Amino acid sequence: MNKELPKVYEPQQVESRIYQMWEDHDCFKGVEDSKKKPFSIVMPPPNVTGQLHMGHALDCTLQDILTRFKRMQGYAALWVPGTDHAGIATQIKVEEELRVKEGKTRYDLGREKFLERVWKWKEEYGNRIVQQQKKMGVSCDWSRARFTMDEGCSKAVRETFCELYDKGLIYKGSRIINWCPHCVTALSDAEVEYVDKPGHLWYIRYPLADGSGDIVVATTRPETMMGDTGVAVNPNDEKFKHLIGKKCILPIMNREIPIVGDEYCEIGFGTGAVKMTPAHDPNDFEVGLRHNLEVIRVIADDGTINENGGKYNGMDRYECRKALVKDLEEQGYLVKTEPYSHNVGTCYRCHNDVEPLISAQWFVKMEPLAKEAIRVVNDGTIKFVPERFTKTYINWMENVHDWCISRQLWWGHQIPAWYCDECGHINVKRDDPTECEKCGCKHLTREEDVLDTWFSSALWPFSTMGWPDTTSADLNYWYPTSVMVTGYDIIFFWVARMIFSGMEQMKKEPFKTVFIHGLVRDDKGRKMSKSLGNGIDPLEMAEKYGADALRFNLITGNSPGNDMRFYVEKCEAMRNFCNKIWNASRFVMMNLTIDHVALPEKLELEDKWILSKLNTLIREVTDNMDAFELGVASAKIYDFIWDNYCDWFIELTKNRLNSDDPAARENAQNVLCYVLIETLKLLHPFMPFITEEIWQALPHEGEFLMLSKWPEYNEKFCFPAEEEAMQTVIEAITAIRARRNEMNVAPSKKVHYTVSTANEASFTAGIPFFTRLASASDVTIVPADAAIDADGKVEVDTHAARIFMPLAELVDFEKELARIAKEKANAEKQLAGIENKLNNQGFLAKAPEAVVNGARADAEKLRALIEKLDASAAAMKK
């Protein structure tokens, strides 16, 4: 016999037990099968330092839905999990712990001992996010869990670095890079976030060396002027072109610098003359190369002014700015100051201002790599969903700069380069060298810098599959992966780099589709952040409402590429949906006497209606899933379960379930159970826990719902005529119920309905449903053109019928109209009070936003009530 479900669904008790059952039976394992098509996903590896946040929860849910869907469709499915070593984030975390607990810095320990601490920290805390992901129900193959600094990934990183270096695609050189003085490391262009900040334009007078006058420049960064080695003007600028070739005096430093002509200068911006600081501005650097200007760096790694800054040496860059502006003013060089808002580069990690400065770093030469990465997207080999992100990606790749890959950290993949102490030659080797390949010297010093974290992440789709072992069975079966699910905020950080790395190392795209999702924002549309204190812990939501409710909340209404707002109230609504499914399933089981589900040959009208509806749902949901329209699919499943199955079909079958005819009872049970099981399959990828728990209690074939066959559209369940017929009956019953409710007619009061319709057959078949669901004492069906005595009757119209109800005998119209008038007057009085508040500008300005929004919502409710009362009164006056 079938199991009995408890009266109340308790997700906290069910979820951990179900997940353990799946794990114990290797349900998540990806197994190569030559008879099956492969479907593979590699998880964007969360930081090993991390805790699950709403972005992770959405990301994991989307990937899990796709993986479960494909697994049920019969694909060999593999979802590879893993974590990222997260260079800066992890090092900062461990350094902070070291400082707080022991009062030490990493330098006190030394590199080797410090790295031992980081590995120990990783072993202690690194599994935390994995356990949190499991609570979300993710069906990863945990036996394949990877780490971006594990042995396999480290081997792939070293092989890639050496290959690119040997091809001339990695080089070391001095260029302008983004430097974070707080994290004390270089950053790539993608790691710089630009923030609009208020600032100033300072107009400074540079005297001409020949004493014939001066040239005025405008700058937002006077603190770099000690490193000025020229002033540039546009050669087409009539105001300045006579000065080209002359020299001027750098104020404060009293150094002669040349005036050069370059079209980089924008006529009309500021004064038209621009100070050139090649060591601290990428554009100035390029101008400097064209005019052979000296490069003088004045800002040190820690953001202070260095020895080239004269008397400002040792000052913080912004303290220097204040002091310098004061000195310029006192010495008569400051012409004027204007407020000016401009974009300032900030570090994506610590959000401090980034300093552009000249530095010797390691770079990846991007132009040759970008060509193939652009081609595979342009020709459709890789598709972006939504398609609009294709343009975002192409625009970035077409304008990409060389990638700065060296970081001044200890935690990470140490660059495999050794400097010869004798001749200075750089030895880049797959295995640690013992002597210089150029001069044979035995004394080599290893590069101290590590690689950008994203360098190892860029190899993730193939390093997790066994590369650089090209004979790897995993690599040959699962690569390229099927889809990459990620947020639009890391298209440049990660997606682009995976694409060019895959094309360069594998000569094949790393994935076929890039499925982009947006950010999860708070209910006001703000980005969740610690500073705002508006973050919502997904684990708290899962604990309170169940992981299924959280997952469904994140998916319903979510559309690819768009940000979504998270409403806690919606979690509660989704928990109610779980309860609705649970209670419906309990009802079905309480009425089950069958041990095996088989659809009867003879189907009733309501059976054909629900089977036809289900058939359409299967086709549409499958199409939506294939098109990555997961939010649309989930909404359709929700509507079908709540409206069609629970609110209607269960009610429509109750006459048969209570019948004295055993065959009628069994037929109803079979259809109820069949539709429930097929619907649970459709819902399973979205709500895996509750669906598995219910399915296990129902008559079923196979061991697990998650491994069962995905429903398929079946022509034999197309019943368009019956579906339309049943729909007309449902529409009529709905309209009758609404009118009875408006007129306060108790459900217990039976009414004789007269139905005037051209569709007599449908309504005749539906008479039993009117009796049960519309409190009908009797139903008379007449042709649409038949004469009707409407005296004392209320008319309800639908698209297929006119329905007459003799409610005069049931309702005291005079008394009911008086009640309605009184209720309406009270509602109008309340509405007037609220509208007075909302028209008061003082209230709108001073009251909290939540209070104002609450007042607006109350006003809308009262307007709706007044409209409903008017409709009820009008119906009685007909």
Regions found by a protein language model. Give the residues of each.
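N-terminal, positively charged nucleic-acid-binding surface of large information/translation enzymes
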Residues: 2-236, 260, 277-290, 294-309, ...
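Short acidic, Pro/Gly- and aromatic-enriched capping/linker segments at domain boundaries
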Residues: 329-349, 433, 437-449
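Structured ligand/cofactor/substrate-binding pocket environments in proteins
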Residues: 55-67, 83-84, 153-156, 214-329, ...
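Catalytic cores of large soluble enzymes that bind and process phosphate-bearing ligands
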Residues: 6, 10, 14, 54-58, ...
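Feature 926 captures the class I aminoacyl-tRNA synthetase adenylation module centered on the KMSKS loop
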Residues: 203, 395-455, 459, 504-547, ...
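Short, polar/flexible loop-turn hinges at active-site or ligand-entry regions and domain interfaces
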Residues: 100-116, 383-384, 539, 560-572, ...
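Active-site-adjacent bridging/hinge elements
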Residues: 35-43, 65, 101-105, 130-137, ...
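Short Cys/His-rich metal-coordination motifs, predominantly Zn2+-binding knuckles/fingers
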Residues: 183, 253, 350, 421-423, ...
